[in-house]
Amino acid sequence: MVLNYIWVAFFMIAFVIAIIKLIFMGDVEVFPAIMNSTFDSSKTAFEISLGLTGVLSLWLGIMKIGEKGGVVNAMARVLSPVFNKLFPELPKGHPVYGNIFMNIAANMLGLDNAATPLGLKAMEGLQELNPKKDTASNAMIMFLVLNTSGLTLIPVSIMVYRAQMGAAQPTDIFIPILIATFVSTLAGIIVTSLFQRINLLQPVLLATLGGMSAAVAAIIWGFSRLDSTMMNLVGTTTANVLLLTIIISFILAGVRKRINVYDAFVEGAKEGFSTAVRIIPYLVAVLVGIGVFRASGAMDWLINGVTWLVSLTGCNADWVGALPTALMKPLSGSGARGMMVDAMNTYGADSFVGRLSCIFQGSTDTTFYILAVYFGSVGIAKTRHAVACGLLSDLAGIIAAIAICYLFFG
């Protein structure tokens, strides 16, 4: 519903500004520019979707091997001690833990198609344990914040889009996204724990979160000591080594499980074409709306206005061009994806803005959409502190993304 209002606003604002330019500024080119943008944006959306098919099939095939090879189950077992502490009101050993673990693990591996059904199943289990059926329980809120923080180990779709948009090294945003999404998740856990009075100083939580924080701090410290050329080289090399290691690990997991690895890959790869075709209408709608908004000059006015405000503080304003992606992400995944593609198309995939928009896309998730779907599926009307915790997690991810992008690419 929110995306509907935003999409209509793109056209209405563009039309009003175009009228003002035509009548008061004598700009006779603005309406032809807007109409040309609709054709160009439609063509761009289709070409992007068509180009996605091959790479998307590759990664969906790899993911299917990991799924059938038991990687998701293995990650669930590793996460078990931590989640027992984050969900103290749930009985130990309750079946709902299985769906919670599977959902989080599937999200971390980028298995969106598997994650959503598992998440809805987990919500049903949590609702059974919920004493107030119209009010979100603490466990529900913690579960949703972990989802909205967008913790992902393999940002497949973003790397695919970067490859399609002509990035020299599509994987160069891999480590920055890992760091930003970790910060977002950590912030979400801390804020939600404060609301729910969960003691984060428990040995298991302290060791896990502290260890991960120390690792991220070490990565940031190490990269901060490198010059920009060496940082890009080390970051890209490390990212590609990690990604290939993950692929090999998935294949070995499949071999160990004695599944037909080739057939599993083909089964997953078949989904690549249908997925690419399925996103065409969404991408056309969003890119045309953004194209009209940009061609009218409204986007320039917005960005220049924010840039001016930021410049008054004396801060660098290079990041402002990627701001539309950050603002759209909590509202709509497809809308933010369109903003990201538009930023790469306008500024270049390897530009600072292009890279930052990708990090924004990967650092958080669609908070309002997730809250609506998950709470709606079990009839929750009173969400308590879920929205506040989700948005604070998003804000932390956005701030971290900006800082990390300056560190790696500034």
Where would I find each of the regions flagged by the language model?
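Signature of multi-pass transmembrane helix bundles
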Residues: 1-54, 163-294, 311-313, 385-410
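Hydrophobic alpha-helical context, especially transmembrane and signal-peptide helices
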Residues: 5, 33, 45, 94, ...
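Hydrophobic alpha-helical segments, principally membrane-spanning helices and signal/leader peptides
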Residues: 36-39, 46, 95-97, 132-140, ...
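Generic signal for short, ordered secondary-structure residues
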Residues: 101, 105, 140, 231-234, ...
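Membrane-embedded alpha-helical segments and adjacent helix-loop junctions characteristic
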Residues: 29-128, 257-346
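Sparse, context-dependent recognition of short Cys/His-centered cofactor- or disulfide-binding micro-motifs
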Residues: 60, 94-96, 136-139, 240, ...
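C-terminal transmembrane helix pair
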Residues: 114-115, 122-162, 167-197, 323-410
